[in-house]
UniProtKB/Swiss-Prot annotation:
This is C-type lectin lectoxin-Lio2. Residues 32-153 form the C-type lectin domain. Ca(2+) binds at E125, D141. It is found in: Secreted. Expressed by the venom gland. One of its GO terms (molecular function) is metal ion binding. Mannose-binding lectin which recognizes specific carbohydrate structures and agglutinates a variety of animal cells by binding to cell-surface glycoproteins and glycolipids. May be a calcium-dependent lectin. It comes from Erythrolamprus poecilogyrus. GO terms for cellular component: extracellular region. Belongs to the true venom lectin family. Pfam families: Lectin_C.
Length: 163
C-alpha cells in the first residue's frame, strides 16, 4: 500500500513540476483557443506590419482568422483598444491574381468579406483589413501601402522558453 501511495504522489509531483507546463502569452498579449494575439496601435503598411509581427515574437505573423468564434474574439479585442479605423490582418493576394493567402501559411477556408468585397478598387487592393464600419467583423481588400493599425498572432510558448 505504501508503494502505491508513493508511486501516486510521484506521478502527481512530476506532473506539477513544470513538465508539460501550460503555454503562456507574453504580458500585454491576449490568449484564445491556444493562440496569443496583440493589437498594435502603430501605423504600418501591410508588409511592414507583417515584418514587425515576425520580429516581435517567434512564429509571429499578422493574424489569420479561421472561425466565426475567432473573428468575434478579435472584434472585441480591437474594440477594447478604442480603434475606430480599419486594422490589417494577415490575408493578401501576393501574386495580385485574386488568390488569397494567409501570411502564416495556414489554409484559407473561412471568409468574412463585407458586402461587395473583395472589389480590387482601382485595381490596387491586394491586402485585407478588418473594416471598422462593421465593428471589425468583416473584411475588405485594401491598398497594401495604406498605413493601419494591425493584429499579430503567435503560438504560446511553454513556460521557461524565451519569447
Amino acid at each position: 500500500m505504501e508503494r502505491f501511495i508513493f508511486a501516486a504522489l510521484l506521478v502527481v509531483a512530476l506532473s506539477l513540476s513544470g513538465t508539460g507546463a501550460d503555454p503562456q502569452c507574453l504580458p500585454g498579449w491576449s490568449s484564445s483557443d491556444g493562440y496569443c494575439y496583440k493589437v498594435f496601435k502603430e501605423y504600418k503598411r501591410w508588409d511592414d506590419a507583417e515584418m514587425f509581427c515576425r520580429q516581435e515574437v517567434e512564429g509571429g505573423h499578422l493574424v489569420s482568422i479561421h472561425s466565426k468564434t475567432e473573428a468575434k474574439f478579435l472584434a472585441r479585442l480591437v474594440f477594447r483598444k478604442f480603434i475606430l479605423l480599419n486594422v490589417w490582418i494577415g490575408l493578401s493576394s501576393p501574386g495580385k491574381h485574386g488568390i488569397w493567402r494567409w501570411s502564416d501559411g495556414s489554409s484559407f477556408y473561412y471568409t468574412s468579406w463585407a458586402f461587395g468585397e473583395p472589389n480590387n478598387f482601382l485595381w490596387n487592393e491586394y491586402c485585407v483589413g478588418l473594416m471598422s464600419i462593421t465593428g471589425h467583423r468583416k473584411w475588405s481588400d485594401q491598398n497594401c501601402r495604406s498605413k493601419r493599425y494591425f493584429i499579430c498572432k503567435a503560438q504560446p510558448q511553454s513556460e521557461g522558453s524565451t519569447w
